[in-house]
Amino acid sequence: MPTILVSALEASSNMHLEELHRNLPEDYRFIGVFEGKNALYSPREFSIMGFRDVIGRLGFLLKAHKEMVQLAKQADMVLLMDSSSFNIPLAKKIKKQDPHKKIMYYILPQVWAWKKWRAKSLEKYCDFLGAILPFEVGYYQKKAQYVGHPLLDEIKYYKKDIKGETLVFMPGSRKSEIAKMFPLFVKVAQILEQNEGFKRRVLVVPSFFKGLDLKALYGEDIQLFEISYDAHKSLFEAEFAFICSGTATLEAALIGTPFVLAYRAKTMDFLIARMLVNLHYIGLANIFYNALNDETPGLGESQLHPELIQHFLSVEGLLKAYEEMDRERYFKESLRLREYLKHGSARKIANEMAFLLNLT
């Protein structure tokens, strides 16, 4: 029975982990940080956003790090997913403790956006790097392989046209994101009802919020919405979506649902990020769409979808994005993006895990 130490702190990572688990033999056992049985911590306990939040919870993070390094002694291999600030130092400590321990990093840090030096650290401490974007491999020397994009394993619904019946609102998976985004989305929903009549309004809630008091998390206005825990099905049925920055933006693009990205960080966090990150866009769909255009002769930089960030984010701006978006162009270009990413990654990662464990 192989035991795998898992560090999956993000909601999206756990969604990818669930699909990976389906492709593994039943006797594989997970320990560590993830959503499920035998977890040392739930990802909810790492729901941190911004530089100040990290400082405020430094004691907890150091404690969790120490416990994970100890837990690695029980594991046959280590699987790290995303969350580089936590996982790269963890890989370093585990390799120092046991140089022969096999470490796989799946969902790589965005070294193409900032901190390119992290690529060297990953190759030094990890045995296999699973790249989910075709262009990522070029940032590494030898240990990275393109394995496909996990969302193409997980998404079962793809639009054949841009028709839809509902408006979908996705204010994020962190409490701090919800506090900033949800009040704006409530106002947008109310104004659209006044202007266009009633439309079904669906609030997509992260699956790991099941069993929690949603009214305490979102406030009294949650009663204005239908609740869904199935993001993909909700996006498939939607005419349009209002989405906080994150993996959900790429999900919407691959499904073919028109949307606007909304994001507002603490001013200091945003200024620091702007100095460090060398990107024109923050939405994954826009980033990957422009990577595709870079590889296509005659195409320059352009947006697949609108982004409203910091002081550009307002109720008026969200309404304007909804009204003015060229839905026909968006749908056509979203199909190009889907073809670019092509296939899923769970089976490939499962095979690589078996190889690292010497089971093949």
Swiss-Prot record:
SUPFAM superfamilies: UDP-Glycosyltransferase/glycogen phosphorylase. The keyword Chloroplast does not apply. One of its GO terms (molecular function) is lipid-A-disaccharide synthase activity. GO terms for cellular component: membrane. It comes from the Bacteria. InterPro entries: Glyco_trans_19 (IPR003835). Its EC number is 2.4.1.182. Pathway: Bacterial outer membrane biogenesis; LPS lipid A biosynthesis. GO terms for biological process: lipid A biosynthetic process. Keywords: Glycosyltransferase, Lipid A biosynthesis, Lipid biosynthesis, Lipid metabolism, Transferase. It catalyses: a lipid X + a UDP-2-N,3-O-bis[(3R)-3-hydroxyacyl]-alpha-D-glucosamine = a lipid A disaccharide + UDP + H(+). It is an enzyme of class 2 (transferase). Pfam families: LpxB. Condensation of UDP-2,3-diacylglucosamine and 2,3-diacylglucosamine-1-phosphate to form lipid A disaccharide, a precursor of lipid A, a phosphorylated glycolipid that anchors the lipopolysaccharide to the outer membrane of the cell. Belongs to the LpxB family. HAMAP family: LpxB. NCBIfam families: lpxB (TIGR00215). This is Lipid-A-disaccharide synthase.
